[in-house]
A protein has these predicted regions:
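Short proline-rich PxxP-based motifs
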Residues: 32-42
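Conserved terminal C-lobe alpha helix of the protein kinase catalytic domain
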Residues: 24-27, 46-54
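Structural helix C-cap motif within protein kinase domains
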Residues: 13-16
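Conserved active-site beta-strand element of glycosyltransferases/polysaccharide synthases
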Residues: 19
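C-terminal regulatory tails of eukaryotic serine/threonine kinases
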Residues: 68-131
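A conserved short helix/loop substructure at the end of the activation segment
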Residues: 52-69, 78
Length: 131
């Protein structure tokens, strides 16, 4: 569900939620869930859409939206006519400016590495507990 939050953020904002040149700082931002809705790109996005992203990008998995909860969110279940009225052209232009392939690949690599590190940490702790 967290990954879905990242994808929705990119689709609605035109750029990823976690951007940093320094990989260590990028990992820190991801682990702490530090991202922003910059008014320049998010001014046209509804509060319901931002709320959905916030609930999906919650760091603690026990309080993060489940798939069922996300599907019942107001933004997901909104009338098609409301969505049709939204102009996403601004997002498309921002997305074109963004070097998506390179940055997204780096973000995915970061998530994969963070998951591997978390898994190694759990394995290490488990081995210590068993000793």
């Amino acid at each position: 569900m967290w990954s879905l939050g990242v994808i929705v953020y990119i689709l609605l904002g035109g750029y990823p939620p976690f951007i940093e040149q320094n990989q260590r700082e990028l990992f820190r931002k991801i682990r702490k869930g530090q991202y922003e809705f910059h008014e320049e790109y998010w001014g046209q996005v509804s509060d319901d859409g931002k709320n959905l992203i916030t609930k999906l990008l919650t760091v603690d998995p026990s309080t993060r939206f489940s798939a069922d909860t996300a599907l019942s969110n107001k933004w997901i279940s909104a009338d098609d006519s409301k969505l049709a009225a939204q102009d996403l052209g601004v997002n498309l232009e921002q997305f074109k400016k963004f070097n998506a392939k390179r940055k997204f690949k780096a973000a995915v690599s970061t998530v994969v590495a963070a998951n591997k590190l978390a898994s190694l940490g759990m394995d290490f702790k488990k081995n210590l507990d068993e000793s």
